[in-house]
């Protein structure tokens, strides 16, 4: 009488029939003599070590969680506790339906024989759920591919926060010694996306913490990077974003106005210091008089210059409200102000 098949953590025989399992403990001989796909002996190995004669490529095993260690180069540093609790509940009810991916550690003296390549969150949840063994695909992965594979899994699962993703990109650039274009081609992302994400690492540390915690979005962070006043101003605006609930669009407008005001003040400051001699614009009789009349009309500084082929009028304003006031004056009929071409 055939013995009933043993339940394999929610996976049954489906996955084991597709992925080689390698020789079981106590078996000898080359891998070509091991159990074949679909045979009655092609079962999973419960916590058995990987022999030196394992089948090349990926093999399927069920491994005790204690025999596995986390990936030290895991790009994701923040694990959502609520989502992890939901996964624990699901594993207790249905088992772990998707295996993790690990690589074998040769010569380990601590009892840990495998290292996670993909699936640290599932491994953590399986431990908390109390599983004796968890399904795993043992794959040969070199050190140079360990970070890349972990990064790609997290990107595809949308589990990295912007700062973790940026740090992982920078680490890949440093370790591979490649350009942004080459990295983009390797991991299937666009070069502008990689460049913009890495720029987030230039933010002040307190602002980075807000982004990592999800309090500020990547859009907010990119807007803050455009603030020219420096780190202190970026931290101050970040606090204001959180306190007032500013949208990304509102943040961008605030940064634009702040930069304009800083440039205006710098312009006035430069006006008090002697500037190097430069070519003077062509002057015509009455041109300065027109500039003064416009300045009086708009109650702001106005400069009028004339080049060889065309002239230019510059009307300065101090704020958005000031601009609206000036535009309102411009829409009125200027003939009563005596601004005729004959005045030139």
From Swiss-Prot:
Residues 1-10 have a biased composition (Basic residues). SUPFAM superfamilies: KorB DNA-binding domain-like, ParB/Sulfiredoxin. Pfam families: HTH_ParB (PF17762), ParB_dimer (PF23552), ParBc (PF02195). Keywords: Chromosome partition, DNA-binding. One of its GO terms (cellular component) is cell pole. Transmembrane segments: none annotated. InterPro entries: Chromosome_partition/occlusion, HTH_ParB/Spo0J, ParB/RepB/Spo0J, ParB/Sulfiredoxin_dom, ParB/Sulfiredoxin_sf, ParB_dimer_C. Residues 261-270 have a biased composition (Basic and acidic residues). It comes from the Bacteria. Residues 1-33, 259-283 are annotated as: Disordered. GO terms for biological process: chromosome segregation; positive regulation of sporulation resulting in formation of a cellular spore. GO terms for molecular function: DNA binding. Was identified as a high-confidence drug target. Involved in chromosome partition. Localize to both poles of the predivisional cell following completion of DNA replication. Binds to the DNA origin of replication. Belongs to the ParB family. This is Probable chromosome-partitioning protein ParB. It comes from Mycobacterium tuberculosis (strain ATCC 25618 / H37Rv). The gene is parB.
